[in-house]
Regions:
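A short, surface-exposed loop/turn module that caps and links secondary-structure elements
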Residues: 28-55
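Short, mixed-charge, low-aromatic patches
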Residues: 17-22, 43-46
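Enriched for short, Lys/Arg-rich terminal
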Residues: 2-6, 10-17, 24, 38, ...
Length: 93
């Protein structure tokens, strides 16, 4: 069962500013997560239904939320890991 992908408005703006190669890598990982979004190793602490995708080589993170009742994965924030900015942005949204 595949989940539908949606973006928060702020996350979509961040997504559009990404370099094409980074966006391509994230797209590939997102496609995998739409099939199975609940990855225990990627769960964010303090948020019951939020997970992350890491691009270790590029230093980027994507934070998403899973809504099982509607079969939706919502991208909350996309950005660099530096100084936890992507996690702070996700916490405020």
């Amino acid at each position: 069962m595949s989940f539908e992908l949606r973006f928060k408005e702020e996350a979509l703006s961040e997504w559009r500013r990404l370099d094409g190669s980074v966006r391509g890598q994230l797209k590939k990982k997102l496609a995998e997560r739409l099939e199975n979004p609940h990855v225990p190793a990627a769960k964010l602490s303090g948020h019951p239904s939020r997970y992350k995708i890491k691009l270790r080589s590029a230093g980027f993170r994507l934070v998403y939320e899973v809504r099982d009742a509607h079969l939706v994965v919502i991208v909350i924030a996309v950005g660099k890991r530096e100084r936890n900015t992507v996690y702070q942005a996700a916490a405020s949204r």
